[in-house]
């Protein structure tokens, strides 16, 4: 069985036993801005929703099992959930936000992998 998650580094392949492989089939990141720069009036969940929509565009994805959002220096709340609500995904798509500063992106990939590999 092969399942992909639409975030993280491209072309990463994990093998789980002899039965299941987990693939990360694409990756993007939000733009990096500066204080009072071009994104000063743009909410981070809007940028995240644009990333989600861009990642699922061009792929035959019928549903997304979950959103795992790595976030540093957040303003509070579940930005992963807000991203999902503002994207083209179903409102029933669950989401979690991981806030570990510099380690949040890697931890979100690890959590998504564990979630998929365990069959949850």
Q: Which stretches of residues belong to each language-model region?
A:
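Intrinsic disorder/low-complexity signal
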Residues: 1-3, 16-17, 98
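N-terminal amphipathic/hydrophobic targeting modules at extreme N-termini
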Residues: 3-5, 9-11
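Conserved "HGTGT" condensation-loop signature of ketosynthase/thiolase-family condensing enzymes
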Residues: 13-93
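Active-site nucleophile and cofactor-binding loops and adjacent substrate-binding regions
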Residues: 72-73, 95-104
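Generic internal hydrophobic packing segments that stabilize the cores of diverse globular domains
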Residues: 80, 95, 106-109
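Active-site-proximal alpha-helical scaffold in enzymes
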Residues: 100-120
């Amino acid at each position: 069985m092969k399942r992909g998650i639409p975030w993280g580094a491209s072309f990463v392949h994990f093998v789980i036993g002899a039965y299941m492989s987990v693939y990360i089939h694409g990756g993007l990141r939000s733009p990096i801005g500066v204080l009072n720069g071009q994104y000063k009036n743009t909410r981070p969940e809007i940028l995240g929703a644009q990333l989600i929509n861009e990642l699922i565009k061009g792929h035959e994805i019928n549903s997304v099992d979950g959103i795992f959002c790595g976030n540093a220096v957040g303003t509070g709340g579940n930005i992963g959930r807000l991203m999902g609500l503002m994207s083209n995904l179903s409102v029933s798509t669950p989401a979690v936000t991981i806030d570990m500063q510099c380690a949040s992106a890697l931890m979100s990939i690890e959590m998504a992998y564990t979630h998929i590999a365990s069959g949850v």
